[in-house]
């Protein structure tokens, strides 16, 4: 499975409150959350992000409070993947649980600019900055995790599995 998109670049320690500010946590509607995603980090982001875009960021992306709203807001905005130097552990789990692929590639972050086009091959773990012609390698996403992503997250994957069990 390949993902290709334009890069949005953010720095270190982007916490869950910067991803989706607490003042919007009175809803869990993904479309509403998407209207405010990353607005405290870049006020133009919600209106300019396009389906298929990719976020890259520095260290400790998704730190702060444990809220599933953060990866939900990112995914609902149309972002297809996040690449960072490192992640807060709880964000890492929450992202895969809702079907948002994330990757750790520290050297890519320093060598990629906002607006560059990047292609990610989840099977091989190869990421190419198409704008600069640079290739990077990371761990491929295991087949089971790719199943979760294709299904739309753990809940949707479980629903499919349970409905398949009902058929047997």
From Swiss-Prot:
Protein's UniProt keywords contain Cytoplasm: no
MF annotations from Gene Ontology: 3-isopropylmalate dehydratase activity
UniProt GO BP: L-leucine biosynthetic process
Domain of life: Bacteria
Matches recorded under HAMAP family: LeuD_type2
Its biological purpose: Catalyzes the isomerization between 2-isopropylmalate and 3-isopropylmalate, via the formation of 2-isopropylmaleate.
Family stated for the protein in its record: Belongs to the LeuD family. LeuD type 2 subfamily.
Pathway: Amino-acid biosynthesis; L-leucine biosynthesis; L-leucine from 3-methyl-2-oxobutanoate: step 2/4
Pfam families: Aconitase_C
UniProt keyword Amino-acid biosynthesis, yes or no: yes
Substrates-to-products reaction catalysed: (2R,3S)-3-isopropylmalate = (2S)-2-isopropylmalate
Record's protein name: 3-isopropylmalate dehydratase small subunit
Top enzyme class: lyase
Alphabetized UniProt keyword annotations: Amino-acid biosynthesis, Branched-chain amino acid biosynthesis, Leucine biosynthesis, Lyase
InterPro entries cross-referenced by the UniProt entry: Aconitase/3IPM_dehydase_swvl, AconitaseA/IPMdHydase_ssu_swvl, IPMI_Swivel, LeuD, LeuD/DmdB_bac, LeuD_type2/HacB/DmdB
Its EC number(s): 4.2.1.33
């Amino acid at each position: 499975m390949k993902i290709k998109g334009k890069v949005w670049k953010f720095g270190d320690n982007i916490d869950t409150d910067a991803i989706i500010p607490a003042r919007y946590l009175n809803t869990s509607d993904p479309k509403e959350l998407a209207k405010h995603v990353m607005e405290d980090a870049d006020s133009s982001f919600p209106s300019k992000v396009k389906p298929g875009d990719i976020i890259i960021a520095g260290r400790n992306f998704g730190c702060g409070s444990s809220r599933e709203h953060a990866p939900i807001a990112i995914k609902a905005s149309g972002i297809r993947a996040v690449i960072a130097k490192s992640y807060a552990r709880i964000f890492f789990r929450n992202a895969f649980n809702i079907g948002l692929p994330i990757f750790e590639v520290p050297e890519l972050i320093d060598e990629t600019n906002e607006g560059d086009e990047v292609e990610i091959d989840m099977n091989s773990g190869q990421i190419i900055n198409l704008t600069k012609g640079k290739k990077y390698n990371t761990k491929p996403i295991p087949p089971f995790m790719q199943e979760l992503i294709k299904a739309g997250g753990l809940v949707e994957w479980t629903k499919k599995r349970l409905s398949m069990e009902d058929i047997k």
